[in-house]
Each structure stands twice: as C-alpha cells, then as structure tokens.
C-alpha cells in the first residue's frame, strides 16, 4: 500500500515516519514539506538515518493523488482543510491530524477556533478517529480525523463512567499536564530552553479548544449535552500527558465494581492498560511508562467523603495522542491487524 505524508517535518510528522518505515504492509511513496522541500528527510529527522532515503517534496496534489493510496495530513490547523477537500474529491483515503475535521457542528469552529469552516459539508463525512469509540465507522470511512492529544487521553478515562450512568454530566473537570513536544517545532519566547525548563505553566486555563471535542464525543455517549471544564498545564517533560479527570458520582460505587466496569468496557482494546497496584510507587497511570508506545494507561481513585471519582489517564502525546492513533486508524481502514506497526514496548528509563 502506497502512503504519502503531507507536512512531515514537525514532531508529529517525524513520529509518523518512524512508525511507517517499520510497518510491514505499507511503503512511503511521498513526503512533503513547504519549508524543507528538497532536503533529505534524515537531515530534519536524524533518528531516521538509514531507514528512509527520501527527500521532502514540494506540495504537488496531482503527483500525491496519483502515487498514493492513502495520505496523512499533518499540517497546522486551518491549513489542512483545502488539501483534504482536494484529496477527498479525488477518492483518496485521508487521515488528518489537524483539528479541521474533528468537530461536527460548523458553528463549533467559530466558537473554539475563531474561523468559519470552508467545507462544512465534509464534517458529516469525517469520522472522529478514536477506535475505542468509532471502530466500525472508521472501517468504512474515507476521511478520518485524529483526535486532539489531551482530548483522547481524557475521553478514554471518562467514557465507561458515562456509558454506565455513574457520574453527573454537568460538572466534569479535566486537568491535563503535557510535555513540550505538544507545542510543536515552531519556537516562541515561551518555548526557549531557559523559559521552558522547570516550568509548571498553565495555558488556556479556560475554553481550551480540546474541550469542544470532549463535550462532543461524551455527548454522543450520553445522548445529551455534556459540560466539561478543562485546564491544561505545560510541564517539564518532552513527551507525555497525564490527565486527572474529576467527576462526581450519582451514587457511591465500590472499587471492585468500578474495575469490572472498566475492564468490561475495554476488554478487547489492545492499547488500553489498567494501572492498579496497592503497593509500591506505581499505583496510578504515569506518562513516564508509556513513552514511545500507543498505550493509554487508565486508573482511578474514589473520594467517598465528596462522592468524587478521580479518573486518571496517561499517554504519549506524539503516539496515542497523534501518530500512533493515526497508524491505528490506518490499520482499521485498510483491514490490517490493529497492532501492525505499533508493537512497541514503552521506552524506559527516559
């Protein structure tokens, strides 16, 4: 299967290439970059030296469509939609890693992103790319939109709680900690080492755009409107997300019952792991132990005094939060084994 990657010079694009070069059933045919056109890929992504000998191509839609069976688009929000529309009209399968097709209501793009969607007719044809939510739709879809990294980490932890009507849906609080790679390769004053090192920095503490995705997807599960308050923080790691999801129980449930619910909900999911250890240091999910993998680790604790259930989830923002999910979606779309190209144990220590 011939694969193309549009916008492959960033962190997510590099991670996509890392996974694709080892995938047993695909061949990378074309890799594009506006800024790095005609440079060797391994000069921008030195870790890929010896694995890929391509140069970045300038964008050529005709060549891309004629030489690739499936295309990943990994360009900034607001720039992907025209590329995706052109490829879609040509019948090419697309996996988009921008936010341009995640939300189903065109009005939500005005609310969360501040711009009017130029192709609202495509929103209903796009599938939100979380296999744990939409596997059957992904199988049949021509266009899959990968989720936001913090959104998917939170969604996986909360979904079973709503499915089983365990929590109040008008008061969910999502607290996310994310590493510096989540900011991408474009530098600014806050991303320089002297300013970034050692921080625990709140950013967009209200109305973060991933809130829209979480409300949309949990609303589909609940079949009603969901209210989510989300506050992300930049922390002193390179890769990884830890999400602490504060939810409030409708009635007290014991720990054993809750574990059964989680395990039954995700018993057939290859990339969901449960962290539950009464002893030792590793009692709860920790992003340190998912780095380089497509796993999302899930755990919880119950605050009986306040009828509060704290659902915790950890992932690698470049893997389950981006490139790993993209490859998982590709495997489903093409009928491959879901773990093809993703059978990596996490790297440790990192």
Residue positions per predicted region:
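N-terminal Rossmann-like NAD(P) cofactor-binding subdomain of oxidoreductases
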Residues: 1-198, 203-205, 301-304, 340, ...
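Conserved active-site and cofactor/substrate-binding residues in soluble primary-metabolism enzymes
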Residues: 11, 78, 125, 152-156, ...
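C-terminal substrate-binding/catalytic lobe of Rossmann-fold NAD(P)-dependent oxidoreductases
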Residues: 27-67, 169-171, 175-176, 180-311
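Short, well-ordered loop/turn and helix-capping segments at boundaries between secondary-structure elements
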Residues: 22, 220, 332-336
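C-terminal helical cap and adjacent loop that interface with cofactors, partners, or active-site loops
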Residues: 287-350
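Short glycine-rich or small-residue beta-strand-to-loop segments that form or flank ligand, phosphate
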Residues: 2-5, 145, 244-246, 311-314
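Short secondary-structure transition/capping segments
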Residues: 12, 74-85, 145-148, 219-228, ...
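Predominant activation on well-ordered alpha-helical scaffold segments within soluble catalytic domains
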Residues: 17, 155-162, 211-215, 259, ...
């Amino acid at each position: 299967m011939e694969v193309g990657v549009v916008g492959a010079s960033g962190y997510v694009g590099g991670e996509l290439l890392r996974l694709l070069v080892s995938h047993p059933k695909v061949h990378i045919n074309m890799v594009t970059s506006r800024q790095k056109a005609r440079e060797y890929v391994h000069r921008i992504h030195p870790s890929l030296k010896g694995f890929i000998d391509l140069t970045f191509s300038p964008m050529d839609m005709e060549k891309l469509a004629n030489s690739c069976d499936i295309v990943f688009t990994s360009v900034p929000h607001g720039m992907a939609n025209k590329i995706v529309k052109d490829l879609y009209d040509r019948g090419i399968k697309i996996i988009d890693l921008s936010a341009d097709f995640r939300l189903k209501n065109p009005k939500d793009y005005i609310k969360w992103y501040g711009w009017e969607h130029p192709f609202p007719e495509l929103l209903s044809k796009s599938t939100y790319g979380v296999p744990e939510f939409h596997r059957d739709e992904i199988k049949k879809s021509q266009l899959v939109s990968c989720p936001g990294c913090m959104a998917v980490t939170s969604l996986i932890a909360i979904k079973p709680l709503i499915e089983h009507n365990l929590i109040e849906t008008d008061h969910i609080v999502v607290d996310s900690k994310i590493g510096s790679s989540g900011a991408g390769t474009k530098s600014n004053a806050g991303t320089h080492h002297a300013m970034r090192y050692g921080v625990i920095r709140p950013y967009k503490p209200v109305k973060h755009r991933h809130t829209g995705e979480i409300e949309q997807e949990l609303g589909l599960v609940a079949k009603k409107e969901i209210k989510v308050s989300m506050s992300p923080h930049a922390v002193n790691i390179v890769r990884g997300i830890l999400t602490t999801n504060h939810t409030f129980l409708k009635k007290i449930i014991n720990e054993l019952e809750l574990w059964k619910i989680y395990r039954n909900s995700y018993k057939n999911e290859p990339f969901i792991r449960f962290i539950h250890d009464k002893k030792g240091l590793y009692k709860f999910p920790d992003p340190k132990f998912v780095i380089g993998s497509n796993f999302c680790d899930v755990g919880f604790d119950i605050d009986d005094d306040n009828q509060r259930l704290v659902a915790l989830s950890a992932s690698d923002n470049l893997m389950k939060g981006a490139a790993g999910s993209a490859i998982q979606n590709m495997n489903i779309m093409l009928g491959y084994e879901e773990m093809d190209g993703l059978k990596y144990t996490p790297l440790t220590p990192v």
